[in-house]
Amino acid sequence: THWKHGGIVGVFGYGGGVIGRYCDQPEMFPGVAHFHTMRVAQPGGKFYTTEYLRNLCDLWDFRGSGITNMHGSTGDIIFLGTTTPQLEEIFYELTHKYNQDLGGSGSNLRTPSDCVGEARCEWSCYDTQALCYNLTIEYQDELHRPAFPYKFKFKFDGCPNSCVAAIARADISFVGTWKDDIKIDQEAVAAYVGGEFPPNGGSHAGRDWGPFDIQKEVIDLCPTECMRYKDGKLGINTPECTRCMHCINVMPRALRIGDDRGCSMLVGAKAPILDGAQMSTLLVPFIKVEEPYDEIKEVIETSGNWWMEEGR
């Protein structure tokens, strides 16, 4: 590659949010002698208005290359390619005109990322956007001024379907869960078995897969074998259930998440080149997600103190 990464480049007061990129042959390619990347913090749940997106695109067309990436693996809006003199101009317009902040880069807390949560999803076990926003504001210094030995990520999944893949991509993963029984509507179960309701919300209706077989498609695929279907009734052995969501996804009109809701906190997901990808390890099986989130912050700060010494 002809790109030189890094370098001391950024905006005043921030140690992250800008990734310096320089061409190693500026005489041959003067147009991309500087081609810095800027990371812009995404809104909660990635909800946008078309006006907002147009404003960002107009700004980047005017002061950058016009090339964007929606989104980076951390979730940020990625602005690809601008010059050093434009960085402060872009930052000023983002913050003063569009009320928008930069995201994280380098050895800092990366921009927290969440799923749509309770705004749209019936399976969300806690308000992902409220928790994500609260922690983003709480840890502004850690986000904008790198002080860690290595990057650190929060990700928030409202349920175990894990739409932002928190369990695979975060140093602390917040995965929604519940403590009580899955709620079963036996009449709706019978409707699925009888073919009245399409399984999987009708997502596989493009071809004829044959009649729905609850034993084959639900019971036998339960990872802990905690389900049974006998005499027209579905039963679940709750202590053995791992909340994998498969049965709920297949029969969403018959099964619902429980009412005693919160989240599990897991730590340590990473993908080192030599060792290969590693999923998060369960740290806190269940914690209530309630403002002001003091119990959650206590776990975070204990983990953060350890990370300052051991992170790599």
Show where each model-derived region lies.
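Short, flexible, solvent-exposed loop/turn segments with mixed acidic/basic and small polar residues
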Residues: 26-32, 65-71, 225-228
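N-terminal basic/disordered segments at the start of proteins
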Residues: 1-52, 262, 273
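Short Fe-S-cluster ligation motifs
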Residues: 185-216, 249-257, 273-289
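Long insertion/accessory domains within large nucleic-acid-processing enzymes
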Residues: 167-172, 259, 266-267
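Iron-sulfur cluster-binding cysteine motifs and their immediate structural context
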Residues: 214-236, 240-264
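A hydrophobic, small-residue-rich beta->alpha segment in the mid-to-C-terminal subdomain
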Residues: 269-312
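Small-residue-enriched alpha-helical segments and adjacent helix-cap loops
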Residues: 9-14, 36-202, 208-212, 221, ...
